Amino acid sequence: MRIAFREHGEQARERADRSYAAFIRSTHRTMNPGVVYAFAAFAIWGLFPIYFKALHSIGAVEMLAHRMAWSMAFLLIVMTVRRQWKWLGPVLRDKRLLARFAASAVLLSANWGIYIWAVNDGRIVEASLGYFINPLVNVLFGMAFLHERLRPVQWLAVTIAAAGVAWLTWVNGAPPWISLALALTFGGYGLLRKTASLGALEGLTLETMLLCPVALLYLFFLNSHGGSGFEHASLSVKLLLAAAGPVTAVPLLLFAAGARRIPLSMLGLIQYITPSLQLLIGVVIYHEFFGHDQVIGYGAIWTALAIYSLEGVVRARAARV
């Protein structure tokens, strides 16, 4: 009897093991790695407030300069390992393209600087709103600069979002300047990069090359005048600052890998992981205020985003049929 039960139990375990192995194989077959890459990229960006909060002892401008410098160092290593320097010569001879990337570098540095300052000034919630608004700002920029025509549903989404921003302006007594500045600088950056001929990694490398001399001069000035926070920081803070290179480049590499493998409509939905995580971190971990008035304003913007995203998904599916 015991032998029979033992054999029956072993057979059941073998069947369970085979079923589990089949499940894993089917999951690997059905799961698009692009989804994993994109999810990881947006999740890392969503966790940025925790990273920058850990560097609160360093001033926002100095932190920005370190981010530029360490990003440049890390990207130089990545590009050298991958032997991807053939693009640089033609780009350096193209003055118009260089001017465009100089402009995008300025917008990128402004976006980084505003975000770093907002996080360390206790305005993570307001910063998250900027990235919720950003997709709708992209729609408006496409209409204004690329002569794209807005569909009725897109007009509805933009109108509802504008009503949400107007509500937050009224209850706070001033527009959400940080949110708007982040959305506009990142929207402008995206517009310039959309019309550029370089890939994501090459473009960021060129931008940091253009920004790095200014960053190094500023850091040298701080150090020579005794105002460097890095000089007096603990070892852990210095290591975190040095990690700004991979922290900046790795999610971008993941994003680029994901964007090549999944539809744009899916990428558009996954991108909301970033501001959602930032909002949760601001409210739950750092106890930033999020009252009824904020729920109404953000609710209007979330409704607009839901309308905008669903319309995009429906159109994408219809186009594939």
Q: What do these predicted ranges mean?
A:
Residues 117, 134-154, 276-295:
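C-terminal transmembrane-helix exit sites in multi-pass transporters
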Residues 39, 43-47, 51, 102-119, ...:
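Hydrophobic alpha-helical transmembrane segments of multi-pass membrane transport proteins
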Residues 55, 63, 67, 118-119, ...:
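Hydrophobic/aromatic residues within transmembrane alpha-helices
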Residues 75, 153-169, 182, 293-312:
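Hydrophobic transmembrane alpha-helices of multi-pass small-molecule transport proteins
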Residues 3-40, 73-101, 152, 204, ...:
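Membrane-interface interhelical linkers
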Residues 175, 272-321:
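C-terminal-most transmembrane helix of multi-pass membrane proteins
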Residues 20-62, 163-195, 217, 321:
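Glycine-/small-residue-enriched transmembrane alpha-helix faces in small-molecule transporters
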Residues 129-133, 200-210, 249-284:
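Helix-helix packing/entry segments at the starts of transmembrane helices
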